[in-house]
Amino acid sequence: MLNFLNFYSVPLAELEVGKHLYWQIGNLKLHGQVFLTSWFVIGVLVLASVAASSNVKRIPSGIQNLLEYALEFIRDLAKNQIGEKEYRPWVPFVGTLFLFIFVSNWSGALVPFKLIHLPEGELAAPTSDINTTVALALLTSLAYFYAGFSKKGLGYFGNYVQPVSFMLPFKIIEDFTKPLSLSFRLFGNILADELVVGVLVLLVPLFVPLPVMALGLFTSAIQALIFATLAAAYIGEAMEDHHGEEHEEHH
């Protein structure tokens, strides 16, 4: 009973999953292993980009061919969700989200982070840490605020009182709950996948975990696609001109 009460006396901010390697910078306490694996993912993406663009060929092959397919896929995704007139400036943002999440998710399954020993905690996919996914969600929020404001100016905030003024608090809450729901879904899926595979490897270390790992790779790719698609959809929604559409319908 005392242990139960002691658990609930712990502040929520101190609750955490597993142990962490902390870096103390002034009054800030950072999760060091998240920075290490994030830098690894960024390094992989930078090296792949340099390798693909260092010797560009008219008929692409190898890494150049792979990244050109990825770019076409991201362009189509952004065009479908944002619209043909507005999508081009947002391709880098949507592409960065998709590629970072995709490589982060797959790194947790394919890279043997567990073999690298740290003073505390252990390395894992960046997206298995709630700090990473919430940061991505907040970037998404800032992106569609900027998209709506740059397209409509102060008129963007008129959407918050449409169709009736008492919708204002609900619209404000919705702006933050949409990307945050994405962040918790991404965090939960990647963390659960790593935990399940880790337990199976301990119990049956040979071939049984392989189908689960393959399923984890598939769901990891789907989670990256969902996050990027909905981020693009939110940006497109913020720039959507309802008045212009109504005017065209009357004509």
UniProtKB/Swiss-Prot annotation:
Show the InterPro entries listed in the entry.
ATP_syn_F0_a_bact/chloroplast, ATP_synth_F0_asu, ATP_synth_F0_asu_AS, F0_ATP_A_sf
One CC-aspect GO term: proton-transporting ATP synthase complex
Membrane topology recorded in Swiss-Prot or TrEMBL = Multi-pass membrane protein
The record's CDD domains line, in alphabetical order, gives: ATP-synt_Fo_a_6
Main location (coarse class): membrane
| Gene Ontology molecular-function annotations | proton-transporting ATP synthase activity, rotational mechanism
Q: Where in or outside the cell is it found?
A: Cellular thylakoid membrane
Alphabetic keyword roster? ATP synthesis, CF(0), Hydrogen ion transport, Ion transport, Membrane, Thylakoid, Transmembrane, Transmembrane helix, Transport
- Transmembrane stretches in the record are 34-54, 93-113, 130-150, 195-215, 216-236
Task: Fetch the HAMAP family from UniProt.
Answer: ATP_synth_a_bact
Q: Which family does it belong to?
A: Belongs to the ATPase A chain family.
Task: Tell me the subunit arrangement.
Answer: F-type ATPases have 2 components, CF(1) - the catalytic core - and CF(0) - the membrane proton channel. CF(1) has five subunits: alpha(3), beta(3), gamma(1), delta(1), epsilon(1). CF(0) has four main subunits: a, b, b' and c.
The free-text function statement in the UniProt record for this protein reads:
Key component of the proton channel; it plays a direct role in the translocation of protons across the membrane.
What is the name of this protein? ATP synthase subunit a
What is the native source organism of this protein?
Answer: Trichormus variabilis (strain ATCC 29413 / PCC 7937)
